[in-house]
């Protein structure tokens, strides 16, 4: 299961050389993951209103080439392993036409209660991810 969003590289996301500053890739990963879950019917605000939170516990990014200011990039979010209390995602950041790979990335999210303690993913989320994924 995957979802793709497009992002235009904003000036504030670049360094003095006009290249994307490395930390901004993680902002894009968050945008892609948030939209992935929204499309599945699980917007973050609704999950939080139900008392569970998804917190990033691992994140890595392999930088291949930097897009430039005003480029449009695709952020592909791909569902990985779904555990009882965690979800893995991988990502591909490419040019609009998919001809240039800018980065690949990975995140692991843990399901937490309102006190920050690990809990099992709610059954409605787990079944949707496992059945549709």
Map each language-model feature to its residues:
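HotDog/MaoC-like acyl-thioester-processing domains
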Residues: 3-5, 38, 68-69, 80-133
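Residue-level signal for pocket-adjacent positions within structured domains
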Residues: 9, 15, 37, 42, ...
């Amino acid at each position: 299961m995957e979802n793709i969003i497009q992002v235009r590289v904003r000036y504030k996301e670049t360094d003095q050389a006009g290249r994307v500053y490395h930390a901004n890739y993680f902002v894009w990963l968050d945008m892609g993951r948030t939209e992935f879950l929204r499309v599945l019917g699980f917007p973050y605000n609704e999950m939080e209103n139900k008392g569970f939170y998804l917190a990033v516990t691992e994140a890595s990014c392999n930088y291949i080439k930097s897009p430039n200011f005003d480029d449009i990039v695709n952020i592909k979010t791909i569902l990985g392993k779904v555990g009882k209390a965690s979800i893995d995602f991988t990502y591909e950041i490419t040019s609009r036409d998919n001809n240039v790979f800018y980065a690949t990335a990975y995140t692991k999210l843990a399901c937490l209660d309102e006190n920050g303690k690990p809990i099992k993913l709610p059954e409605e989320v787990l079944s949707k991810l496992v059945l549709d994924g």
